[in-house]
Amino acid sequence: MKTYCDSSFDDRRGIAGIGVTIVDGEKRRTYSSWIRARSNNEGELFAIHLASILSEGRGIIYTDSQCALSYIRGDVKDKPRTREQYINHKYCEYWAKQIKRRGIATEKIKAHQKGFDVHSMGNRIADLLANEGRAKFYARQ
């Protein structure tokens, strides 16, 4: 099973569109929605967390967010300078711990590739679903 996830952040409104696509053989499931978020990194981490739930902890979750993977692996060395950065950092750490607790494998893939291989297509679909998630927020307005 391969799961691709992405986030599309709107800084002005403080929301992130979330997109997840799960490929299991010939079957494909998709999900798009939005969440309140302080940063794109929080959105990316939430997308990975949601993907781990939707895929029931099976297979590998692919993301194009190096920062999210750094949080999951505990490699983030940045020191928050402002109160807002500190709060964002703590939320990102929270989601990273939730992902680690589920014990699912995560891997990095390149973003915005133009090829027709499985990974680029999966990532592009997740990206499109994340944008659709943002559109769902805008449609509520």
Residue spans for each PLM region:
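RNase H-like nuclease fold core
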Residues: 1-42, 46, 50-57, 73, ...
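RNase H catalytic domain
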Residues: 4-15, 50-124
